[in-house]
Amino acid sequence: MLTALKLKNIVLFESNELVFKKGFTTITGESGSGKSILFKSLDVLLGGQLSLSSSKNIQIGNDKSLIEGTFCLNNSLKNWLIDHEIDFDNGELLITKEWRFRENKIITRSRINGVMVNRKQILEIRPLLIDVTSQGVSNKIIPTEEKLFYIDKLTDKTIENL
């Protein structure tokens, strides 16, 4: 579960931190208030592509920009962290994506609990963290295998794929 999202120097957000509590969270606001920026930031944090040329995507400002997400640990995440030799002392998972601008170049770094990781590792851990389904997208709300698991669990019988 996502417990906090921090943005620094990302489009409208000079410095902003959202804290999420257990339960259902709704993000509402007028057009242009930054809702899409929040979701795009979360996507980029978890391995999504950042396009600096598109006005629909995040635009980086200042010399340094940062997106940081804090997540509760579950057993799957703990196992992943153990397999990748990443410490998890406090029961939380902290993912950080940082951009620095030097000599007309953009240097990006991603970290999990302070350890530098690559995009492949971020994409590997993404399904264990969050599943965002946006308006008009219904192709992957629940995978077929998971649907069958719940049906089997409700009926006490195994349903086979045809």
Describe the function of each predicted region.
Residues 4-7, 11-162:
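Gly/Lys-enriched N-terminal cap/neck module of very large, oligomeric protein machines
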